[in-house]
Amino acid sequence: MSTFLLEIGLEEVPAHLVTSSESQLVARTKEFLAAHRLTVGDIKPFSTPRRLALQLCDVAEESEALSEEKRGPSVERAKDENGEWSKAAQGFARGQGATPEAFEERDGYVWLTKHTTGVPANQILSQIGEEVVSQMKFTTYMKWANHSFLYVRPIRWLVALLDEQVINFNVLDIATGRVTRGHRFLSTEHVTISDAQAYEETLQSAYVLADAENRKAQIKSQLETIANRNHWVLSLDNAPAQDLLEEVNNIVEWPTAFSGSFDQKYLEVPDEVLITSMREHQRFFYVRDTTGKLLPHFLSVRNGDTAHLDNVIAGNEKVLVARLEDAEFFYREDQQKKIADYMAKVKTLVFHEKIGTVYEHMQRVGLLAEKLADALDFDDDKKTDLARAAEIYKFDLMTGMVGEFDELQGVMGEHYARLFGENERVATAIREHYMPTSANGNIAKSDVGAVLAIADKLDAIVTFFAANLIPSGSNDPYGLRRAATGVVRTLTTKHWHIALQPVLAEFMAATGTVTASADLMAVLSFVVDRVRKLALDDDIRQDIVSAGTDNFATADIVYLTDRIQVLANHAHDNNFREVISALTRVARLAEKTPVSLNVNPQLFENETEKALYAATSELQLVALEANGAEALYQALAALQMPISAYFDATMVNVDNEQIKNNRYAQLNIINQLIAGLGNLEDIVIK
């Protein structure tokens, strides 16, 4: 078995595109191999800032031979009245590259067996340039020279080897060969690869660690070694550290870790500022002592060896200190003003030209937060703190620190609020109102912060809808889907049952023209769509998600989420099919008549009507006392047998109008309760 090597040599690829490009190369190669029926063993990917590559191990000598049976016209159409092959038969044979003499007659049709012989591997692999390399798609492109061809970065060289043999093809004017490039500074410019299997070893001798996972492991090991030697605590398990490790891994080919320091005086600045300066701006890893206190040291990685490392450390320290000087200055200067001073400036800050200022947005948020607090029965202390938080929660946008480090908005608001004498609940809410900051980010823990976060996001959704700035397709420039997801996740995490429909209706009526033109049902549907998306992401069946969200009534997000989960949990019950069949039969019949809930037991004609009536009366009591969708499902499931018996013995559409309407009224009562679980007709019975 042979080994194939493909390497695409590039100018430096942005760090955030390297890993996804490597994955895409593997995926497209798998599709290519499947399309050409060429079997291989393992596929080993490689990537650095300057190259995307892969090795195909155990490549078959040729593609799999293929025999396909093709059915032609019927025997009757295949021959004319003289028994000769018809034009239809001859055309079919010609289209398959055969003659009618190769026909077989079977099952009333003529058949051809088409044999495709295997194609040598080197012949197939010569097409990988056109079918894989040239077809790669990226979120960022460049053009170079006079080519109209677009790629993530200009291609500078190509290597394609099947064992020792060069597989010839071109991409633009770049021909494949066996010459790669080593490290830009530590190696000679051109490095020859003798054999496809020698790729990784050859590059390592040229100061390139091509295996991204191996390179990352080495970086992690080097960082931990330095931290342990100095008795520092280095945390690499949290998401930001993992992201930084991935970024650093994708900007180096030969990693060498080192440590640096800064003056202890800068530790007077909040930790978040120092960490942001180190991690976000300089790609440094911060360290703490065993008590959790931030230390005046950092760890970093250079793309090179240990030569002149002292100069590298000094240069990095100098750049960091310049950042910290700015941070210290802004931190000191910001405290010279009061919150009222910053709020005066917020009044001039534009939220959106079609909507108004940030200050006006805050006023609406305060009103909506008050209505949400009423719905949640907040006590007076919480309401007071919520009102104060809503009054000032964007003040830090006008501080010098947030102007310099915009990713610290909310974080600095919390710090400054404490320094300016605001209580803990208000200060915490200022930071938490941005949460969650990502699809899977943390939810606000405090009740005041969570309500402020919900109100802030809902006002944005309503006002942007009113301004007809509604997301379409994948286009969502104002992050409204993310905001709606945050609303859903906050409500479900806190398990807050809030009927959004009446709350938002009252809010929109009170806030006038800026929200009046918003379509309330469109807004609610938009938020409920996020419930659907989150449920589908949890691998819940599409039909169950649809059933649970189609009828969202007052838009109690927690109840919608609960009933989706309840239906999903019971979908594996032995009697689920029977329960859903019985309930949907009731629903379909009830939909055919105007709703009437006046049932006269005196008009019952058989025992099954009486039994169903008694069971339904019990169900109504259970539904009134039920604490969630689970109790309602259990109560409705208990009706399955009475419903089945009822339909076995009872004809609903009888001639007697009085009896017929009485029976429909009984079904309508049950259907109103069924609607509490959603539109069960959406469920596919398996």
Curated annotation (Swiss-Prot):
Cellular location(s): Cytoplasm
Known catalytic reactions: tRNA(Gly) + glycine + ATP = glycyl-tRNA(Gly) + AMP + diphosphate
InterPro entries: Gly-tRNA-synth_bsu, Gly-tRNA-synth_heterodimer
Alphabetical list of PROSITE patterns matching this protein: AA_TRNA_LIGASE_II_GLYAB (PS50861)
Biased composition (Basic and acidic residues): 67-84
GO cellular component, one term: cytosol
The protein's enzyme class: ligase
Biological process, per Gene Ontology: glycyl-tRNA aminoacylation
Sequence segments annotated as region (Disordered): 65-99
Assembly behavior: Tetramer of two alpha and two beta subunits.
Family: Belongs to the class-II aminoacyl-tRNA synthetase family.
Protein name as catalogued: Glycine--tRNA ligase beta subunit
Organism (species): Leuconostoc citreum (strain KM20)
Gene for this chain: glyS
